[in-house]
Amino acid sequence: MKKAIFIDIDNTLLDFDKCAYLSMKRSFEDFGLPFDDSMFDTFERVNLSLWHSLENGYISKDQLFKIRWSTVLAALNVKADGILMEKQFKHYINTVAITIDYAKEILEYLSSKYKVYATSNATYEQQISRLKNADFDKYFSGYFISEKVGFEKPSKEFFDGCFASLPFSVDEVTMIGDSPTADIKGGVKYGLDTIWFNHRGESLPEDIKPKFTVNHLKEIENIL
């Protein structure tokens, strides 16, 4: 019998792509730099690659934040200070909370039946601030943010850290998330039932097998 839910934040509950787009646009405006959609495409490509490197243990979070914007700006051939851009981007991303469709409703539903815990590889300050701004914090029984846990998803150590403070067994918890690697692969390897939120209509690598797949958050109500 399920008693608790682990649920990812970015691109599962909060639309990170839209939040990042707005934060990048505002940051570029602050620095007097031109901005267009193709520039954001470059940011997404670089950012995703760096987060995959983090998940695989190739770089630390501090390294990611130090090189992210210098890498993006170099790829765009834009002359600006990457460290200052990172600081400005974080200023905006910490406050912007654009939600995924039906996120509020699914949190209301899940929290009425289970203990719900947020899981994330982003920074604690950023995620707590954004969840509060979205008025989502009231639905959670706790937060497992890698910065506090000490390890990143999808590592075994991350999930060990989660369960160390919980009265639940692995078979009593379901993991929900959009990332095939961080959320689903990590959850499956740990022995959790998983629900892959595939809102982009992507295909999965053959070695990643979620128990359930949904394309809209409302579909979770038919599973849990």
For each of these PLM feature ranges, what is it?
Residues M1-I5, K18, A80, E108, ...:
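Asp-based, Mg2+/Mn2+-dependent phosphohydrolase catalytic module
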Residues K2-D101:
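N-terminal helical cap/lid subdomain that shapes the substrate entry/recognition surface
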Residues D30-F31, A75-L76, K113, S165, ...:
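Alpha-helical structural context
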Residues D101-Y102, E157:
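Short, conserved clusters of charged catalytic residues that mark active-site
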Residues Y102-K113:
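Catalytic-core regions built around general acid/base machinery
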Residues K113-K115, L192:
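A generic structural motif
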